[in-house]
Amino acid sequence: MGILPLIWLLGGPWRDHGTDSLAVLKAARRAQQAFEATRRANLPELPGSATGMCDERIGRLCYWYEGGLDTTPEEPPRIRDARVKLLATLASAAEALPGDEWIVGQRIRYLVEHQAYDAALHVMASCRATLWWCEALGGLARHAAGDFAGADSTFAAALRDMPEDERCRWTDISLLLEGALAKRYKRLDCAGRETFAARWWWLTRPLYSLGGNDRRTEHYARRTFARIEEDTRTTFGLYWADDLRDLVVRYGWATYWTREPPTSDLVRSEPRISGHEPSPSFRFAPSEGAFDNPGGAKPDDWALDSRHARDRYAPEYARAFVPLDHQAAVFRRDDSCVVVAAYDLSHDTLFTDDSVAGALALAADEQTVAIARDSGLIYGTRALTVTAPCQPFVLSLEARAPREHHVARARYGVATAAASPEQVEISDLLLFDPPDSVRDDLSAVIPRAYGTTRLATPRRLGVFWELYGARQGSDSTPATMALTVTREGGGGWLRRAAQSLGLVGPHRNVRLEWQELPPPGPIAPRSLVVDLSDLAPGRYLIEVGVAPAVGDRVTARREITITR
């Protein structure tokens, strides 16, 4: 952007303090309508952009999602030049009517569209409209610029300062809910809905490792954008109505538009215009089960790639958002839990850049998040540990390639509880690449932990676990321990037929059993190296069972897949 256009964006080319307010506002509205007419007349043509295949019909509108990486066409110079002139007109109108909400809203909307974020923030610094509206516009500008933490704080201030009935409308998430959650939400009063929404936003947050909840700031940015567009002529050529508002709140606003080529040179008609939201986009909302019991949530309680999603969001930092293969285990320390998580992106074709930023977050609620961060080269396994109180929490392991804009995430619940001093307990199993000499110590095992449970025919597999309360007082009776590796499933019909004919042997399993006297003390670390070289590729269950002299038998399990 040149210097002259920037001056136009901020200050305008002319000032007329003698113009009456109504005339100024009418002129500004005519300028906005004229710009949208110019935009419609100069949109790039895209055959087949209006397919008629709708995922959702919302009033007058047809919405569909094609997926894939978006390729935004270059904006025609005529549209860009016309926007600069509109912004100059709006800047002049703002000089005459500095407190007008419609004018300042249009300035922010078109500055954000122009990607002039610094100019938008400059405008907000001198905003003289209603306080909460200025704050909401500032939240929109900060969110669009990628300052999610700043946007979160600014929107929080706007919600605090707006009238109660307005706040109830802005915090309403009914358009984003479906099924049983939608029915439950509908029965709540405003205060109950705010409590419900706080929990929902916590579980909907895409990455706990980023400052601010960008899915929530996206929602309030959409609410702000929808209010800006009220009583305006839109790019579609339609006047604003509830269907356009619902579309924006659920799927966001279009970042570019295209039109269908004319069907005939003889008949002139209004062009068929398609708005294009950013892609790929995802649904980050939790299932009802995860909402009610976060500590028991499963990975598939977040269906990011749902084809017919109730809502969508395309984070600017994620051209891809994929599951993260990993291994995680929980170990006790008094009333705290140590969570170890390891991942390995060496063979992930999405992560071709050398560097990755990783994080392990344990979220008991929105305000209680323990997090460890890590960054470095993608080659080899990276392990992170977090210590937090033993309680149910959501585990979120996150890896991000900032330059490639790729994200991988593993998220699910972990239902830990305080240890019982009178009961023998066992930790999770942690698989590792064993050295020649194995030391029974968690800190020694973590650097060698596998970043996956898919193992390429390992000859030797290290298995680490801890026992708690296994030897109480002066008890000197040994405990019986066993480790088994068992093939899951019986194989396909072809293998069963070959086995019945004696062409192949039965699946091999591994079983080790021994007795030992646990050492005194609250924690008894143990590790064992198992030879798996005779096992065929497939899915297996590793189980460690301990039968103490007093008390019930305890077990820990880990599923693995052996590949060639």
Predicted regions and their residues:
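Intrinsically disordered, low-complexity terminal regions enriched in Ser/Thr/Pro/Gly
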Residues: 14-79, 284-564
